[in-house]
Amino acid sequence: MCIRDRELTVPILNGRCLPAVEIRTSESFYNFNAKYVNKDTQLLEFILPNNKKNELEQICLKTMDVMGCRCWLRVDLLQDKNNNFYVLEVNTVPGMTSHSLFPKSAESIGLSYNDLVNEIINGK
């Protein structure tokens, strides 16, 4: 089975999901070229109805729990045409560069880079 509809990521910080980010690229997946070379890659707020947003967050928090993770991580997923979610991978040390998804999501809710780093360090 090949799922090619929507690629997204959900950062989790101290037990709470930050806004999901949808990744749109002309590449076949979010690879090095899509991240750093291509100018057409878009990182968009992933808009969902409340019931699907709650489902997505529960999947991500359950994934965190099953993996035994805490503090911070990022869950990468696909969503198919029937709106089902599939976990691709868990990033236990998400990127923190200017191109990285975790700080971009935090920024979208007004959490500065410095505040984000402090929350990660202090675990609060």
Predicted regions and their residues:
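Extended hydrophobic/Leu-rich segments
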Residues: 1-3, 120
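Phosphate-binding site of ATP-dependent enzymes
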Residues: 3-51, 79, 86
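ATP-dependent carboxylate activation and anion-phosphoryl transfer catalytic cores
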Residues: 50-124
